Amino acid sequence: MDHRLLEIIACPVCNGKLYYSQDKQELICKLDSLAFPLRDGIPVLLETEARALTVEESHS
């Protein structure tokens, strides 16, 4: 994941900062507790494609 891209993209739900999870290949919005997938290295920033983070994931 290109770190320059992380500086300019935002959560499509709340416009908050996204964090890259290398082990799960997801972009994480901590404010909304959502994880957006990467497909072939491309972020899929659609609310319908996001998964809800578990309580454990939200607090890590």
UniProtKB/Swiss-Prot annotation:
What is the top-level taxon of the source organism? Answer: Bacteria
One Pfam match: Trm112p
Q: Which cysteines are joined by disulfide bonds?
A: none
- GO cellular component terms? cytosol
Which Gene3D superfamilies does this one have?
Answer: 2.20.25.10
Question: Coiled-coil regions in this chain?
Answer: none
Instruction: Give the family this protein belongs to, as stated in its UniProt record.
Output: Belongs to the UPF0434 family.
HAMAP family attached here? UPF0434
Which named protein is this? UPF0434 protein KPK_3615
- Name its species: Klebsiella pneumoniae (strain 342)
